[in-house]
Design a protein with these regions (language model features):
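Bacterial N-terminal signal peptides that target proteins for export
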Residues: 2-12
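Surface-exposed loops/turns
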Residues: 350-351, 394-395
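C-terminal tail/sorting-segment detector
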Residues: 26, 395-416
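Residue-level detector of functionally pivotal "anchor" positions at catalytic/ligand-binding pockets or at interdomain
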Residues: 325-345, 351, 359-360, 364, ...
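Surface-exposed, beta-sheet-biased, low-hydrophobicity segments with strongly acidic/polar composition
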Residues: 26-329
Length: 416
């Protein structure tokens, strides 16, 4: 890979040489760089442990279906200028025609949320429980079905009407057509084809399912997306959204971001936009990265890193530069954290303390198992957060089974 040495990075390197000579900064700074290509052509999956894990063309997809065991939504490619409009009841499918595009300016489009991957644009209007926004869970049939439809505006000016019809046994079903009803098609996306991944991508124009997410571990996705930069103001930005198993702590006001500040696991968050876009600013025709900020990142492997952005060229080249210091290595006996919607903190936990369990969908039942298969606790749950006590747990490994109407997930809990 080509390496980009900007004056800003050279200044960082010079200060780092001084810092490394001191006892407080004995660990090596690893510099890395990669490119999103001019115009941010590519989205880049990045592993803090090992570098670029994969790339994909940003414009190749329109929808990204959440294929995690308890996933139940779809994202739109808002970073490419795509918009999603609510269009009423599915029974009005034949009523929607080309006149919708003429009146779309009076309708507020739905947006992806940027706190969690489960906040797809199709989830707008949901209640976080049985109503997913696009569809409602049927407690009799145990399926999610929809009576809603949407209109999609694609970046090339094409308009489509679209309905995400159902999610049954891990299979999304949907239909799509031009506004005048031509080019109608139906298709499905099965979660089982994407085990261990977060998203299955889809191109509506080509009617093509795309497997773009790398098989190898990744921690950050550098991508063009839409962020609410202030209340009611949505704007296209370029930045990093994290893997759901990654946690991040942001530290500001540092004289030397490679040395100052300390990791505090209690200050870490699993919000996917914890790094986001605001580590840089634009002015005078160029970008400047913040020279007083670092991020402490706990990767999917459990390794803890100090991460500092050292350069960003903007859309002219798409080049990104950073430096990182390994604070604590991964436990090689532990497998990387899977892509789940449920999270435990702290983990590991000290015996006798409480553990907070959060889930991106509404939980219905929690079961704690010992590693030898003995049931330790059964907890009825309703909502997206619950506190579990470890008072009755001896030090060791446990399995926490989380159930919701979307499915089940199992998280490993270590009690020390």
């Amino acid at each position: 890979m080509n390496h980009f040495f900007t004056p800003f990075r050279i200044a960082f390197a010079a200060s780092a040489l001084i810092a490394i000579s001191s006892e407080s900064a004995a660990q090596e700074i690893v510099y890395d760089d990669f490119t999103m290509n001019p115009g941010y052509e590519n989205m880049v999956y990045y592993s803090v442990d090992s570098g670029v894990a994969g790339t994909a063309i940003m414009a190749s997809w329109d929808l990204a279906f959440d294929v995690r065991p308890m996933g139940g939504t779809a994202l739109i490619n808002s970073g490419q200028g795509m918009s999603l409009f609510p269009a009423g009841a599915l029974s009005d499918w034949d009523v929607i025609d080309d006149t919708f595009a003429d009146n779309a300016g009076t309708i507020v489009p739905f947006q992806n949320g940027t706190a969690y991957w489960s906040q797809g644009a199709f989830s707008e209007g949901g209640d976080g429980s049985f109503d997913l926004g696009w569809g409602v869970y049927d407690i009799v049939t145990h399926t999610i079905a929809s009576d809603k439809m949407y209109v999609i505006s694609l970046p090339d000016g094409t308009w489509k009407k679209f309905a995400l019809l159902s999610l049954v046994s891990g299979v999304y079903s949907f239909q799509c057509a031009n506004l005048d009803g031509t080019d109608f098609f139906e298709d499905q996306v099965a979660k089982s084809n994407y085990l261990g991944k977060i998203h299955a991508f889809y191109n509506l124009t080509n009617q093509e399912e795309l497997d773009l997410e790398p098989a190898s571990e990744w921690d950050m996705l550098f991508i063009r997306y839409v962020e609410e930069i202030q209340p009611g103001v949505n704007y296209g930005v370029t930045g990093a959204l994290t893997h759901p198993s990654v946690r991040v702590q942001e530290e500001n006001g540092l004289a030397d971001p490679f040395v100052d500040g300390a990791i505090d696991v209690s200050a870490m968050t699993d919000s996917i936009n914890a790094i986001g876009y605001d580590w840089k600013s634009y002015g005078g025709g160029s970008f400047t990265v913040l020279d007083d900020r670092c991020y402490f990142v706990e990767s999917v492997t459990g390794a803890q890193w100090r991460l500092v952005f050292t350069g960003f060229d903007g859309s002219m080249t798409g080049n990104v530069e950073l430096g990182k210091i390994l604070v604590s290595g991964a436990d090689v006996s532990e497998s990387p954290a899977p892509a789940l919607t449920s999270h435990l903190f702290p983990n590991p936990a000290t015996s006798g303390t409480d553990v907070n369990l959060t889930c991106e969908s509404s939980m219905s039942k929690i079961t704690v198992w010992s590693i030898n298969g003995q049931r330790v606790a059964d907890v009825a749950a309703r909502g997206q957060s619950i506190t579990l006590s470890t008072a009755a747990m001896e030090p060791g490994m446990y399995l926490v089974e989380v159930q919701s109407f979307l499915g089940r997930e199992v998280i490993r809990l270590t009690v020390q």
